[in-house]
Amino acid sequence: MTFNEKTVLITGGAGFIGSNFVNHIYKKYAKYKIILLDALTYAGNLDNLLPEMKQSDRFRFFHGNVMHGDIVKELVAQSQIVIHFAAESHVTRSIYDNTLFFETDVIGTQMLANAVAHHPVERFIHISSSEVYGTAETDPMDENHPLKPLSPYAAAKAGADRLVYSYIQTYQIPGIIVRPFNNYGPYQHIEKAIPNFIISALQDQPLTL
């Protein structure tokens, strides 16, 4: 198998960031096969994906949750690269339904990391969040900034982040942890800050911070 013939498992690939990434690698790597696992919550939409992808033999979609260990193990075993976007990702929602966040973000990540530990892959990329840092104590912030999450969502992401790190140390999984700061782009849900600001501005409403 050459570099251009990988099978990539992407969780949460129908969401905002995940779908942009799926579309990108589908176009850039013509021989990559893509397996997409997504629960299709309110934030996931298969219409975010390129129309031609859905008819391609390079693409397979599985409707499921990362907490479902059996399907996760099955799909990881078929993959060389695993990229984990799937998560509940809204600070305010996490305040009112924090159980869902800890189940999806922490237990779901554990299921995936367990599968990677048992079915070795070439790379496991975990998408964390800058929310794990809390309020900035240094300028600029870097990876050495202490983790001080300020919401249930941030705490769940911090838990998943440290879980993956522990698996890198304990089981030597080939993991990378990415902590993106505020993202903006196509397919972003209107509950997020920048789309909300744009809609408010178009309606001549005040921009509430």
Regions from the language model: what does each represent?
Residues 158, 183-196, 203-205, 209:
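Glycine/proline-rich active-site loop of Rossmann-fold NAD(P)-dependent oxidoreductases
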